């Protein structure tokens, strides 16, 4: 934790020094010198923290107090800087003379106290012979590792082939008396990976299917609702009598369900009242995974058990080899010395045959030189046996991370287990916390540097890739439950963050909380009712169902809060009153509201001059305040619904931006802003805008976007929703960087070859009129990988997706989805050369004849 706090202090001191230099110039040279001194000293202390931690781990108990002193010092300095920066900005706003202001004198006095503490710490570390390692690995530029995992197989089952074949045969055996298969074993053996691969292979042979993560604190009602949604139970039946309606449907269906990670039998006692027995008469199946054999035995009986075992040595080394070299090659070790191979085998041996430990260790070694010396150091750090399963291996991989990446990894522990986390959220929260900063001379954006960190974590196999974007970048990710536990344990030990269950206790400890996450309504409300002192709180995560969370927040100022995330999971829409005290969160940089809620952000939000991200989920009807544009640090304003609901969020004329009050250099995302509140000529000022979504697009906006020289040179994603048919022809061919385009119109709108950017990767057309000429244009796009056409009218009776005379027919297309086309009598594609790289074909809502080649028929199943 000490090194994390020190890094945060260094980054914040860089920011403050920059602000002083820009805003106050030479008048405050003495104050800037103090800030620069802080930065230098914190870097110096950080350089020997790792050495001190190694001595502590080696049994030198005297160092423990030194590390505690360093952590307290770093925390106090961070508090001082967080308190100081808003005062600089406020003073500059009202043209006060900062040099004569009282808070500047107070700051100077606090710096003197810190100097005395730094002298004491440096004296003690010399006494204990703690070496300055000058380790600046956090400042190194992480390589973009995207190429290492873009095409990786996400369902590796190396060493589990026999298990897979045996279970597949069992699940498809029509004579199976009781259709439950229980995959059990210790954490990290690959139970979930194996179960998912089985489930995905056989689910098409059943009438309905569902995959549910159960977890340590399950709720039967939520699990049943999840199953009901996946099998297509109507919304009315889910609301009226979920249990009875679900059971009635499943009685007449042949189903397969995967219930992942069941911890105890109580939850099964609740579920089995609704799930009909899986007997041989109907042929339904249930796959469960559990780390407890007794759970599997209770649910499916002795015959259901399939216990996974650690991998044998050769299979372990095969998995290690695949992960080290990133491809299957029997000659991978041909150029390696016999000693290096032997060290590699010894490293694998210390992993105890546990796939997760092997994969994580390989990820760590990939980031190092492939030399005997480098690998030997890892081997020596692993001890002589596997301790606590693979816990030591995982902790070693954490310590091997660059210092700047460690808090980014720990952030995954703030989310519930098995939560799918958007890369956009992680990246912008890391930036808000100043874990990621752009050094002078670096022309890349902070978001790009943060993405490098995320790529590195995935490359090291610490994080699991869940989804990719249209262009192959990370869209969302997950963390294995063992690594999630590691995050929580490390965070608690170092006071980086606390979960709700360990937040209660000594008031002094509660007052020092910097980050806290709640997964439970009851615990959260009880905690807030205890009236805790939370003056140092930086991050608050609330995963809840009770909308009263907002009223409880009204009793706290949270003056140092950087990040606020509220995720509401209730099924009904709830009106919430967001307290005006939100305006007191002067340090707030990141605000995310998600869930079925409606309300209004208070006007006091405009006082939050450091706000960088406002992210409102598609189910939330949260009205933005007037003046939100004026935050000069605003980078992302996201409203994720493009329907009428989103339009109603902007029903205040005062939202209309003053074009001269904008600070456009930072703005990167404007998503689903109604055109009526959007002045087209401000587009010229948004020079760094990467993503833009506009509702009710007007002729003037179309005209501005369609000029010969692109008005938004950095634009990568464009989403336009038209409420009427524009008279202007949209022309986007001059935008070379737009890779994702979404066009939605309610009436006829003409398109031609000039309508599209030349380098499209993903295109979505909704409610458009399409003819064979436009289709012929789309077939020629050299980079188009995903094409979706929803409720589009086709001007002719037959849509032919076959190759053109020139041979072109979607050369790079991987996904094609056509839904509810109007006016068609036939869709055909019978040749074998069209769409050669297609992986997924979805033809839904069709009421016409479909003629496909045998290859395409298989892809459409």
From Swiss-Prot:
InterPro entries: AAA+_ATPase (IPR003593), Apaf_helical (IPR042197), Disease_R_plants (IPR044974), LRR_dom_sf (IPR032675), LRR_R13L4/SHOC2-like (IPR055414), NB-ARC (IPR002182), P-loop_NTPase (IPR027417), RX-like_CC (IPR038005). Its main location: membrane. LRR repeats lie at residues 225-248, 305-327, 388-411, 449-472, 510-536, 585-608, 609-631, 652-680, 689-710, 712-735, 736-758, 784-810, 811-835. GO terms for molecular function: ADP binding; ATP binding; ATP hydrolysis activity. The keyword Membrane applies. It is a peripheral membrane protein. One of its GO terms (biological process) is defense response to other organism. The keyword Transmembrane helix does not apply. GO terms for cellular component: plasma membrane. Keywords: ATP-binding, Cell membrane, Coiled coil, Host-virus interaction, Hypersensitive response, Leucine-rich repeat, Membrane, Nucleotide-binding, Plant defense, Repeat. ATP binds at residues 185-192. It is found in: Cell membrane. Gene3D superfamilies: 1.20.5.4130, Helical domain of apoptotic protease-activating factors, P-loop containing nucleotide triphosphate hydrolases, Ribonuclease Inhibitor, Winged helix-like DNA-binding domain superfamily/Winged helix DNA-binding domain. Residues 162-388 form the NB-ARC domain. Residues 63-83 form a coiled coil. It comes from the Eukaryota. Transgenic tobacco (cv. SR1) plants expressing Tm-2 exhibit resistance to tobacco mosaic virus (TMV) and tomato mosaic virus (ToMV), tobamoviruses that can multiply in tobacco (cv. SR1). The Tm-2, Tm-2(2) and Tm-2nv alleles present in the tomato mosaic virus (ToMV/TMV)-resistant tomato cv. Craigella isolates GCR236 (AC Q71BH0), cv. Craigella GCR267 (AC Q71BG9) and cv. Yukang 2 (AC Q5MLE9), respectively confers resistance to ToMV but not the tm-2 allele present in the ToMV-susceptible tomato cv. Craigella isolate GCR26 (AC Q71BH1). Inhibitor of viral mouvements which confers resistance to some tobamoviruses including tomato mosaic virus (ToMV) (e.g. isolates L, W3 and SL-1) and tobacco mosaic virus (TMV), but not to resistance-breaking isolates (e.g. B7, LT1, LII, Ltbl, ToMV2, and ToMV1-2) ToMV and tomato brown rugose fruit virus (ToBRFV). Elicits a hypersensitive reaction in response to avirulent (Avr) movement proteins from resistance inducing tobamoviruses (e.g. ToMV and TMV) strains, thus leading to programmed cell death. Belongs to the disease resistance NB-LRR family. (Microbial infection) Interacts with tobamoviruses mouvement protein at the plasma membrane; this interaction triggers defense responses leading to programmed cell death. Binds to HSP90 proteins; this interaction seems required for defense responses toward tobamoviruses. PANTHER family: DISEASE RESISTANCE PROTEIN RP, TOMV SUSCEPTIBLE PROTEIN TM-2. This is ToMV resistance protein Tm-2(GCR236). It comes from Solanum lycopersicum.
């Amino acid at each position: 934790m000490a090194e994390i706090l020190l890094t945060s202090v260094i980054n914040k001191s860089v920011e403050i020094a920059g602000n002083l230099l820009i805003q106050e110039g030479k008048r405050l040279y003495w104050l800037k010198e103090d800030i620069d001194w802080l930065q230098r000293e914190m870097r110096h202390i950080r350089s020997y923290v790792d050495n001190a931690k190694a001595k502590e781990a080696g049994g030198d108990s005297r160092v423990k107090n030194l590390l505690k002193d360093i952590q307290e010092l770093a925390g106090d300095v961070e508090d001082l800087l967080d308190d100081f920066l808003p005062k600089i900005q406020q003073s500059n706003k009202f043209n006060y003379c900062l040099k004569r202001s009282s808070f500047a004198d107070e700051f100077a006095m606090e710096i003197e106290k810190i100097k005395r503490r730094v002298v004491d710490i440096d004296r003690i570390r010399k006494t204990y012979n703690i070496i300055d390692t000058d380790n600046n690995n956090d400042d190194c530029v992480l390589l973009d590792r995207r190429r290492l995992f873009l095409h990786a197989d996400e369902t590796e089952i190396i060493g589990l082939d026999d298990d897979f074949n045996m279970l597949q045969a069992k699940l498809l055996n029509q004579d199976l008396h009781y259709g439950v298969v229980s995959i059990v074993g210790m954490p990290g053996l690959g139970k979930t990976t194996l179960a998912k691969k089985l489930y995905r292979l056989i689910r098409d042979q059943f009438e309905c299917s569902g995959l549910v993560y159960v977890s340590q604190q399950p709720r039967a009602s939520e699990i049943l609702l999840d199953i009901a949604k996946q099998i297509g139970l109507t919304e009315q039946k889910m609301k009226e009598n979920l249990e009875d309606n679900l059971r009635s449907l499943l009685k007449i269906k042949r189903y397969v369900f995967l219930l992942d990670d069941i911890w105890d039998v109580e939850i099964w006692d609740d579920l089995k009242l609704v799930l009909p027995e899986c007997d041989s008469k109907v042929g339904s199946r249930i796959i469960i995974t559990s780390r407890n054999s007794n759970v599997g035995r209770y649910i499916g009986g002795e015959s259901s058990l399939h216990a996974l075992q650690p991998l044998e040595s050769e299979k372990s080394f095969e998995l290690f080899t695949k992960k080290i070299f990133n491809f299957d090659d029997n000659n991978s070790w041909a150029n390696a010395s016999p000693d290096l191979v032997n060290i590699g085998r010894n490293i694998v041996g210390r992993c105890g045959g546990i796939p997760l430990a092997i994969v994580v260790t390989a990820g760590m070694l990939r980031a190092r030189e492939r030399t005997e010396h480098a690998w030997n150091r890892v081997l020596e750090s692993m001890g002589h046996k596997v301790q606590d399963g693979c816990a030591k291996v995982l902790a070693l991989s954490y310590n091997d991370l660059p210092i700047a990446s460690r808090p980014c990894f720990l952030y995954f522990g703030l989310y519930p287990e098995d939560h799918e986390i958007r890369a956009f959220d992680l990246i912008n929260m890391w930036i808000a916390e100043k874990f990621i900063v752009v050094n002078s001379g670096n022309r890349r954006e902070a978001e790009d540097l943060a993405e490098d960190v995320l790529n590195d974590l995935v490359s090291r196999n610490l994080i699991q890739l869940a989804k990719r974007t249209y262009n192959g970048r990370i869209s969302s990710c997950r963390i294995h439950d063992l690594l999630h536990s590691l995050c929580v344990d490390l965070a608690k030990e170092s006071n980086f963050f606390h979960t709700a269950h360990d937040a209660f206790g000594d008031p002094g400890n509660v007052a020092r909380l910097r980050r806290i996450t709640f997964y439970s309504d009851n615990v959260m409300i009880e905690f807030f009712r205890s009236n805790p002192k939370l003056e140092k709180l930086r991050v608050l995560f609330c995963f809840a169902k009770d909308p009263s969370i907002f009223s409880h927040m009204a009793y706290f100022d949270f003056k140092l809060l950087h990040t606020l995330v509220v995720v509401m999971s209730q099924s009904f829409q709830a009106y919430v009153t967001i307290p005006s005290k939100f305006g007191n969160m002067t340090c707030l940089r990141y605000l995310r509201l998600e869930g079925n809620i409606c309300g209004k952000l208070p006007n006091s939000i405009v006082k939050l001059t450091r706000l960088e991200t406002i992210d409102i989920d598609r189910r939330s009807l949260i009205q933005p305040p007037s003046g939100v544009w004026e935050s000069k640090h605003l980078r992302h304003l996201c409203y994720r619904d493009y329907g009428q609901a989103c339009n109603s969020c902007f029903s205040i004329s005062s939202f209309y931006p003053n074009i001269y009050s904008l600070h456009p250099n930072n703005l990167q995302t404007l998503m689903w802003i109604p055109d009526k509140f959007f002045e087209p000529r401000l587009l010229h000022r948004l020079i760094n805008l990467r993503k833009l979504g506009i509702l009710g697009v007007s002729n003037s906006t179309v005209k501005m976007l369609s000029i010969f020289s692109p008005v938004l040179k950095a634009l990568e994603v464009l989403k336009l929703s038209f409420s009427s048919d524009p008279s202007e022809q949209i022309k986007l061919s001059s935008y070379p960087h737009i890779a994702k385009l979404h066009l939605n119109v309610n009436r006829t709108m003409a398109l031609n070859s000039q309508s599209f950017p030349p380098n499209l990767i993903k295109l979505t057309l909704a409610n458009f009129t399409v003819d064979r000429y436009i289709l012929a244009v789309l077939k020629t796009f050299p980079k188009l990988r995903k094409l979706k056409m929803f409720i589009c009218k086709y001007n002719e009776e037959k849509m032919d997706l076959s190759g053109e005379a020139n041979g072109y027919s979607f050369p790079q297309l991987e996904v094609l989805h056509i839904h509810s086309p109007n006016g068609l009598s036939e869709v055909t594609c019978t040749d074998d050369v069209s769409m050669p790289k297609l992986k997924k074909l979805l033809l839904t809502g069709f009421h016409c004849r479909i003629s496909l080649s045998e290859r395409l028929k298989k892809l459409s199943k």
